[in-house]
Regions:
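Short, solvent-exposed mixed-charge patches
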Residues: 30, 212-213
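Short, low-complexity, glycine-enriched hydrophobic/amphipathic alpha-helices that associate
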Residues: 29-98
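Helix-termini ("caps") and immediately adjacent flexible loops/tails
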Residues: 4-5, 25-38, 83-205
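Bacterial Sec-dependent N-terminal signal peptides
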Residues: 2-13
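Bacterial N-terminal signal peptides
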Residues: 11-22
């Protein structure tokens, strides 16, 4: 059910956003442009989806909707940049695609911090040890939002590799840091909601759904 909502929301927002951007940018029709758009769209969408999911965890909001919106903005930005670049020289292509990727990454890093962002990307790729290392660095931050994001990434990572006891042990820390979550039960429900969102992202972008540790 969650994945159905994800797909419907993403499809609808993509249709609206792509139509609006196309009016302002025009389109490139050669094969390189199409390839650039596809690659830029996919990588941007994954980053956007993960960033949206984490932003919802830290700042509040619907996780599935935030992830879908992040995927649409990230994917469309990458696809349009890739399509435009495809009509130009290789050097210009590389510069524009890199600029689009960097801008998207920096936006989410500014919201949740570089360590937490790197951690959730590693988690999506089933790199649990790397995710934990980044999460713990994030949790040391003197910026409360960054630190909270780090604890969330660690909890999600432990839950994803089916270490339920370790994941639940982090819930009191989340309750203490999060302004909106008042009980361990609320934190646990939110954790599993985010875990479902993470797995939806993996399904959508052909990443392994269940990781073997």
């Amino acid at each position: 059910m969650t994945h159905d909502i994800w797909r419907l929301t993403t499809a609808f927002l993509t249709m609206l956003l792509t139509a609006g951007l196309a009016l302002g940018t025009g389109c490139a029709s050669d094969s390189y442009a199409a390839k650039g758009a596809a690659q830029g769209g996919t990588s941007g969408a994954v980053a956007g989806a993960l960033g949206g999911m984490m932003s919802a965890l830290v700042f509040g909001g619907d996780i599935a909707e935030a992830g879908a919106r992040g995927a649409v903005w990230g994917g469309t930005t990458g696809a349009v940049a890739g399509g435009i670049s495809g009509a130009q020289t290789d050097k210009a292509v590389a510069a524009q695609e890199q600029a689009a990727r960097d801008a998207e990454l920096e936006r989410f890093k500014a919201e949740i911090g570089t360590d937490a962002f790197n951690g959730v990307v590693a988690l999506a790729e089933c790199k649990h040890d790397i995710a934990i290392a980044n999460a713990r660095e994030a949790a040391k931050s003197n910026k409360p939002d960054y630190a909270l994001a780090g604890v969330w990434v660690e909890a999600l990572t432990e839950a994803d590799r089916q270490r339920e006891q370790e994941a639940r042990a982090l819930l009191p820390d989340i309750v203490e840091r999060d302004r909106d979550i008042k009980t361990k039960a609320e934190a646990e429900a939110r954790m599993y909601e985010a875990l479902d969102g993470l797995r939806d992202i993996r399904v959508e972008y052909n990443l392994p759904v269940n990781c073997s540790s």
